[in-house]
Amino acid sequence: MHAIIIHGMGRTPLSMSLLAYRLRKAGIKTNLFAYAVTFEHWEGCTKRLRQFIERKVAEEDFIVVAHSLGSVLTRAVLPSLSHKPAACFFLAPPTQACDAARRLAPRYWYRLLAGEMGQLLAKHEFMSNLPVPEMPTKIYAGNAGLTGRYSPFGDEPNDGVLMVKETLLPGIPVQIAPSLHTFIMNNKVIAMDIVDTIKSGKYKLS
């Protein structure tokens, strides 16, 4: 079993290294995809991701584990794959034009650093038209962000970047984790849940 692992915006594959280690320890081969939102455009990045997946897994069984923007890239690429993943696991995925992206989109420094892909996260039409995975998928949402009077999210459960309700997709199960957005991939419970799901054969994975 292969795992294609995709990091989030402004990060590198290094941010997913602990999760990758835990999966490898369980006997899962890991392949980490790298991209840079500051220097890449959406079309080129999704094309590279599709080619990366096809090259790394060939006809072998595989899953996708993606953090944040990585899940958006994954959803865009899935329909074009001739060999589909057996399952997808999304960590803190933005599934709509989230409040944080909409607030940051007009700012010059954000446009400069986050590039085209950062702007797309703030567009309702773009986010609502992304394909919903047809294969078994699970979402992990963090709720360790500040709530209450001094929180930009008010009383809404959040991970410091996304509100939990901004990570949901119809018909896809979600597991809440006491994690912040930036570090949710280091949550051992999530890694073990992915491993247990695969090993248990729940999704009929080999």
Q: Model segments located where?
A:
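C-terminal catalytic-base region of ester-bond hydrolases, centering on the histidine
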Residues: 133-206
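Serine-dependent carboxylesterase/thioesterase catalytic core
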Residues: 2-9, 14, 18, 22-36, ...
